[in-house]
Amino acid sequence: MAVPKKRTSMSKKHIRRNYWKRKGYKAAVKAFSLGKSVSTGHSKSFFVQQTTTKTNK
């Protein structure tokens, strides 16, 4: 027969939520940093062909 489990304490709940949020924040910072390095051309892990626009007069 199913028995209800004990309630999780608030401190444990906050720890788990903060850890989950921190993981997302770190992933966002890493993605932003990679995007910034790719856009400036300083990336060492991605090879992006830079396109230059020339104006003809």
From Swiss-Prot:
It is found in: Plastid, Chloroplast. Coiled coil: none annotated. One of its GO terms (cellular component) is large ribosomal subunit. Keywords: Chloroplast, Plastid, Ribonucleoprotein, Ribosomal protein. InterPro entries: Ribosomal_bL32, Ribosomal_bL32_plant/cyanobact, Ribosomal_zn-bd. SUPFAM superfamilies: Zn-binding ribosomal proteins (SSF57829). GO terms for biological process: translation. GO terms for molecular function: structural constituent of ribosome. PANTHER family: 50S RIBOSOMAL PROTEIN L32, CHLOROPLASTIC, LARGE RIBOSOMAL SUBUNIT PROTEIN BL32C. Belongs to the bacterial ribosomal protein bL32 family. This is Large ribosomal subunit protein bL32c. It comes from Amborella trichopoda. The lineage of its organism: Eukaryota, Viridiplantae, Streptophyta, Embryophyta, Tracheophyta. The gene is rpl32.
